[in-house]
Amino acid sequence: MAAEAAAALEGSEPVDLAKHPSGIIPTLQNIVSTVNLDCKLDLKAIALQARNAEYNPKRFAAVIMRIREPKTTALIFASGKMVCTGAKSEQQSKLAARKYARIIQKLGFPAKFKDFKIQNIVGSCDVKFPIRLEGLAYSHGAFSSYEPELFPGLIYRMKQPKIVLLIFVSGKIVLTGAKVRDETYTAFENIYPVLTEFRKVQQ
């Protein structure tokens, strides 16, 4: 049942609980991808012709374009480089990037679709128990920075896989820096026993 629920949540392939011994599967919240349209772009012309585009060169040297399906935002640069953010899965990110490329083609530019690459996957989950961040920071000092007056979460820089985790006292976890989703899952399974070790005992 848990696996089915998780698969329904993910909206993609079914989840193998052998791979997720904690029984918790981080939800992908944001995918950042890049692609090279491989042609020079006139950003002013794009901003004038595309209805879902804004361009303020004094503020930022790229056209900001949005589409509703998949709900994403693209940053389009004069060099032909494009960054796509906001998708909830790798497939959606690629689909969105292709849609932006097609919009640029329809505006008369010879845009191609080269070197599509996932640059960052952001996932999150909730372990459903409070965590003693001071204790965790103390015993994992080499990987942790915890300065509650600056930021309420503990920042944990995992070496293998190379993932940054934000760990909150509430038990909410954010994982960032993955290039493939399995890195997100592995990082969470690595940290889970540590989190249970520093579980706050409710008085």
UniProtKB/Swiss-Prot annotation:
One of its GO terms (biological process) is DNA-templated transcription initiation. Sequence repeats lie at residues 28-104, 118-195. This is TATA-binding protein 2. General transcription factor that functions at the core of the DNA-binding multiprotein factor TFIID. Binding of TFIID to the TATA box is the initial transcriptional step of the pre-initiation complex (PIC), playing a role in the activation of eukaryotic genes transcribed by RNA polymerase II. It is found in: Nucleus. The keyword Hydrolase does not apply. It comes from Oryza sativa subsp. japonica (Rice). The keyword Membrane does not apply. Keywords: Activator, DNA-binding, Nucleus, Repeat, Transcription, Transcription regulation. HAMAP family: TATA_bind_prot_arch (MF_00408). One of its GO terms (molecular function) is DNA binding. Pfam families: TBP. Belongs to the TFIID complex together with the TBP-associated factors (TAFs). Binds DNA as monomer. Interacts with RF2A and TFIIB. Interacts with CWZF7. Belongs to the TBP family. One of its GO terms (cellular component) is nucleus. The lineage of its organism: Eukaryota, Viridiplantae, Streptophyta, Embryophyta, Tracheophyta.
